[in-house]
A protein has these predicted regions:
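A short alpha-helical cap/connector motif
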Residues: 1-129
Length: 129
């Protein structure tokens, strides 16, 4: 089994006896549950990679729409170090987001691309990650 950035972190990332990367995001969702005031929250996730964070954001139930911006291409040190291909990354993304197809919208491009940026209005989203 290969390492991932959230669910199965590399040994050299470990600084505790538990997965602090996973728990850090869970703690963030707890804070968000206290801060977000609306029922119909929308978010943008820049760099969804394998969809592990997307899975956690979908599972927490705070968002009715999660917009993922991920090109699934280019240079990624984590891919090189852990022998991942972009095809494998996309397959993991698809697996990790499969339960949230009704709220997850994938924008398969770079976050700085004008055609992606033009899809989002500043005042329409409650959280950007």
């Amino acid at each position: 089994m290969k390492h991932t950035q959230r669910f199965r972190i590399p040994d050299d990332w470990k600084c505790h006896t538990y997965n602090h990367v996973y728990f850090g995001l869970v703690e963030l969702t707890i804070k968000l549950s206290q801060l977000l005031e609306f029922q119909d929250n929308k978010m943008i996730e820049i760099g969804s990679y394998m969809g592990e964070s997307t899975h956690i954001f979908g599972s927490c139930g705070l968002f009715t729409e999660i917009n993922c911006i991920e090109p699934f291409s280019g240079t990624e040190n984590f891919n090189d170090k852990n022998n991942h291909t972009w095809e494998e990354v996309w397959e993991e993304y698809d697996i990790n987001t499969r339960q949230f197809k009704d709220i997850v919208k994938l924008h398969e491009d770079y976050s700085y691309d004008e055609k992606v940026l033009s899809k989002f209005n500043d005042d329409e989203y409650d959280f950007v990650y």
